[in-house]
C-alpha cells in the first residue's frame, strides 16, 4: 500500500508539472534563460536546420541559467525544450542576431600637452577570460556600431553632439582628438545601421578638467571672431612683454581679418 501511495504522489506531481514563466535574454552575446516551474527539468536546445537536441542542463530547478555558446550566432531560429517525465514544452526564439542586445560603450578621456583624446571602446563579448570587441566579426553577426558623442563644456547645460565617423574606428574602438581649456564631460551611444536596429544605452559620463597650458576659443561663424580676438588679446597682454605684445597684436589683427574673410566666403 505504501508503494502505491508513493507512485500516486509522483503521478500527481507529473500531472501538475508546468513552466509558469520563461525569459530569454542575450546582452553582448552573454545568453541566459530565466524560468519558473515546479520540480526538476532537463533543458536542451535545437538550432534550426539541425535535427538533434543539445543537452544543456540535467535535473535542474527553476532559476537563471547561462546558455551562451548553444544558440548559433546567426539569424537562424532556435528552440529551448524543458522536460520532466512526460511533460514537455518548447520555447521559440527568432534568432540570436535578432534578439541580442548590445551594452553601452566605454568612454576614455586622455589629456596630452596640446590636445585631449577621446577613445570610445567598443562593447565586448566575454569568452572564457577573453574580452572580444563587438566590431565587424562574422561570429558576432557582423555587428558594428556608429557612435554619437555628447560633449558638455564648462557650465553649459546644452551638450554639443558629434557623430563619430567609422573611419576613426578600429577593431578595438574609435579615437578623435580635440582641444579645450574648459572642463569637458563626454558620454557616448552606439547604434547600428540596417534592419537590425540596435541602439546601446548611453555610456557613463566621463569628465576631465585640462591644465591651462593651451589657450583655445571655439569659432563656429564670423560672429565668434571678435570674442576670439578679445580673448587672445588678453592672453598677449598678460603673458608677454611689451616688445612682444606689439608684434603679436598686429599678427592677431591680421589673423582675425583672414579668419573673418574665410568664414564669410563659407557663408
UniProtKB/Swiss-Prot annotation:
GO terms for biological process: symbiont-mediated suppression of host innate immune response; symbiont-mediated suppression of host type I interferon-mediated signaling pathway; type II interferon-mediated signaling pathway. Keywords: Early protein, Glycoprotein, Host-virus interaction, Inhibition of host innate immune response by virus, Inhibition of host interferon signaling pathway by virus, Interferon antiviral system evasion, Secreted, Signal, Viral immunoevasion. GO terms for molecular function: cytokine receptor activity. SUPFAM superfamilies: Fibronectin type III. Glycans are attached at residues 42, 150. It comes from the Viruses. Residues 1-17 form the signal peptide. Its main location: secreted. GO terms for cellular component: extracellular region. Induction: Expressed in the early phase of the viral replicative cycle. It is found in: Secreted. Belongs to the type II cytokine receptor family. This is Soluble interferon gamma receptor OPG193. It comes from Monkeypox virus.
